[in-house]
Amino acid sequence: MTKRRVSGKTVEEAVEQAIIELGTTRERITYTVVEEPKSGLFGILGSKPAVIEVVVKPDPVDRAKAFLEELLQEMDMEVEVTIEKDPATVLFNISGEQDLGTLIGKRGQTLDSLQYLVNLVANKEEGEFIRIKLDAENYRARRKEALVQLAERLASKALRTKRPVSLEPMSAHERKIIHTALQELGDVETYSEGQGIGRHVVIAPKR
């Protein structure tokens, strides 16, 4: 946590100066007034500036990345974590020369669990919610492509047999991929059935 004392003619001027010196934003600092400004005799002699002590709040993305890197180190994973940002999401991409299958887990379950923990760490303090997406060697895109192909294949089967086809249980995110992939098809419908970890998508011919 970075601390610094900064002075200015007024408290507000000191705050603005602190933001410039620390290269941050007003939302990411807290400050206490150490000394109030004094105008002095005739506004000149004996005047004293305002002095504030500024504390920069830890960046939630940096905090989450440090947590993830420490966790991966404990797992003996020699990998690199890179960050990409867009207006809606922060992407943490894990890459390395070793096999990342263990890190990804069956159907990405281990990766999803790590993503959940990383988001908890990033958002443990009050403030704007930050959504972090965790990926490893482009697994998410490859999995999405596989799910779309599966959805199209099973939709054809449902139409051919004129019977509903049930998919294996999936996470809410993966079920959404299936629903979205087939929503433009006019001759099939999709819906979810089951509870908890057994919840799955059903693809059925429209009646």
UniProtKB/Swiss-Prot annotation:
Alphabetical UniProt keywords: Cell shape, Cell wall biogenesis/degradation, Chaperone, Cytoplasm, RNA-binding
Membrane-spanning intervals of the chain: none
Region (Jag_N domain): 5-55
Domain of life: Bacteria
Pfam entry (one): KH_KhpA-B
Subcellular location: Cytoplasm
The UniProt record lists the keyword Transferase: no
An example Gene Ontology CC term for this record: cytoplasm
Statement: the UniProt record of this protein carries the keyword Cell wall biogenesis/degradation: yes
Biological processes, Gene Ontology terms: cell wall organization; peptidoglycan biosynthetic process; regulation of cell shape
GO molecular function: RNA binding
Free-text comment on this protein's domains from its UniProt entry: Has an N-terminal Jag-N domain and 2 RNA-binding domains (KH and R3H).
Family: Belongs to the KhpB RNA-binding protein family.
Subunit structure as annotated in this protein's UniProt entry: Forms a complex with KhpA.
PANTHER family to which the protein is assigned, alphabetical: PROTEIN JAG, RNA-BINDING PROTEIN KHPB
Role played: A probable RNA chaperone. Forms a complex with KhpA which binds to cellular RNA and controls its expression. Plays a role in peptidoglycan (PG) homeostasis and cell length regulation.
UniProt-recorded name of the protein: RNA-binding protein KhpB
